[in-house]
Amino acid sequence: MDDKKKVVYIAGPITGVKNYWEAFEKAEEDLIGLGYIPLSPAHLPQGMTNAQYARIDFAMIDSADAVLFLPGWENSEG
């Protein structure tokens, strides 16, 4: 039996969204409660370029088993 926890990347808008971290934190808490390992771009440091964020995000997505799309994800710049 495979006891490995599934990893879930949380996709959602950050740039220009006031209090964006609240939605990401709620999603993280929900995923942890369900036994998943969340990967959240909301924990990345501020001040990098969009290209730097994209490289990190793509690596996280590549490492994930699934993606959770938060409301407004389709409007995200990333």
For each of these PLM feature ranges, what is it?
Residues M1-G78:
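Conserved catalytic or regulatory cores that recognize and/or transform ribose-phosphate-containing ligands
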